Swiss-Prot record:
Principal place of residence: cytoplasm
GO cellular component terms attached to this protein's record: cytosol
Keyword presence, Lipid metabolism: no
Biological processes per GO annotation: ribosomal small subunit assembly; translation
Lineage start: Bacteria, Bacillati, Cyanobacteriota, Cyanophyceae, Synechococcales
Xref: SUPFAM superfamilies: YhbC-like, C-terminal domain (SSF74942), YhbC-like, N-terminal domain (SSF75420)
Organism: Prochlorococcus marinus (strain AS9601)
UniProt family annotation: Belongs to the RimP family.
HAMAP family found in the cross-reference section: RimP (MF_01077)
Record protein name field: Ribosome maturation factor RimP
Subcellular location as annotated: Cytoplasm
Keywords carried by this UniProt record: Cytoplasm, Ribosome biogenesis
Amino acid sequence: MNKENKSKLEALLEKVANERDLEICGLNIQTNQNPVVIEITIRKTNGDDISLDDCALFNTPASDEIEKSNLLNCSYVLEISSQGVSDELTSERDFKTFKGFPVNVELNQKNSKIKILNGLLYEKSKDYLAINIKGKIKKIPFDEVLKISLCTLKD
């Protein structure tokens, strides 16, 4: 599939997604497979979780539009999935959802080394992140934080 047809297919699928308050966050076309595999990752525009029903409700109109477009002149498999949960916490929703969960916090040190703190996510404000490390709350200014990730708690 050439770039022009891939762009047309992507625009077509985005239109179908937008009509259902969804957005495409990933599109992978595996033309080396027989049949061709089209993997589409979707999420809801309002941030709600994607259900299996949402994937199924997107599948039929997406498939219909692909057929009508004649962009593919071969058989294909359409796979619709949700974005899933990322290990890295970035959105306000992530911080609310995973409050109390174990996290690794990567800190930027003045000597350009990275320090990792491990604890339970306690609180996030606009200025700092608070984690519970063995019963003590540590407030970390956001300008020191490089990355916050879910993890398994270490002793």
